[in-house]
């Protein structure tokens, strides 16, 4: 008998599905069939686990013609351990995890030896985690009070939120001394979980803030340079995301299944979105200098064109496959995880900020860009080719949005109007931080992200957004120019 058939036989014996026929043949019964006038059960071979046949057809028989195979209490306990050992040795980690979960919370003590043996052999991190929890739960039924208290401490140290309820419910069935330890460990674990949840809220705020900063950096450059409220900036993000999707489709055609497409798509997302930004400036905005209302309406029209074009080409919903390196996350505790994809976005934003700061403050292009932002006419008189600076700035702003779109494929679907979710918040970041101010953009973006995620656990998302907008309005009443006041042409006008 092979291992799979042996494991199935043990489970059948444990569940009372092994019987004898009138001729004394040992069989395993399947589910009852009530389609006829009386119930019948199919029979299986206990050795091979395959269906038995009689006359070339599946053998079915009335349950009344079968006799039970008696299994005593001690034998049933041995069967539980043996069955658990078979289930816990399954080659599939997901099956092993499911097997452990089936023993929780009340069956762990009956199969504790099998759980301990499985823990000593387990290599998979996820399965080891739940095995440790199951062993600690099983040891709560230890024969001595010392063993029970030690198990409670280990259970609390593992950090699983379900242990709080478990310890408090078990406190009523033990001695007062042990119950005191149970309650103390439950309170200790609850406080730890609350603290870790606050850390997770801060992390979520930093993650949202990083996305807003990544989108708003390009918007701040364009708005600070040309004074244009670019309503198509969210669509630059969408262009970067769809470029990633196209690269994935091309790779799946010639090299299916790999993750290299994601990294290859990075420069193409930046270049494509940057070129769309240059095209927008050349075709539309250069004709509308110092006409802010017309510029706003024109960019809004361009955004509608880009959205409908994407919808016509790709449909309403597409998705980009997440690279295997970004699956899972860093576990602060059993119930608190920091996803790798969002950690990557935070790191990406930090790197992008460093590169942008270098471009703006350590290169001739940055010097000319800042000069044009401060005073376009004087810069032109000094020989700066302002039209060329405009093109490069729009390429940089669009490229940063394309970079954000590339990163956004890690945390959401790719849809034609995906930029709408961030364009308003990005404008809030730019205005609150100060027009064209990189440091202000970072502070405002992170602040808005943290406040948004901090309000969500207390208020609903909609009410949290209303409160956030109210706070920004009050702040702008005190500092109309934002955290850092702009200088140059924007201030003069």
PLM feature segments, named:
Residues 202-246, 279, 283-293, 432-435:
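Single transmembrane alpha-helix segments in multi-pass membrane proteins
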Residues 313, 324-325, 374, 381, ...:
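Cytosolic-side transmembrane-helix boundaries in multi-pass membrane proteins
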Residues 257-303, 309, 443-448, 479-480:
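Alpha-helical transmembrane segments within multi-pass membrane transporters and channels
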Residues 336-414, 443:
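Helix-loop-helix "hairpin" substructures at the membrane interface of multi-pass membrane proteins
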Residues 1-165, 169-197:
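Extended repeat-based scaffolds of very large eukaryotic assembly and lipid-transport proteins
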Residues 201, 338, 359-360, 364, ...:
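Inter-helical junctions in multi-pass inner-membrane proteins, predominant
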Residues 233-279, 458:
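Membrane-embedded helix boundary and interhelical linker motif in transport proteins
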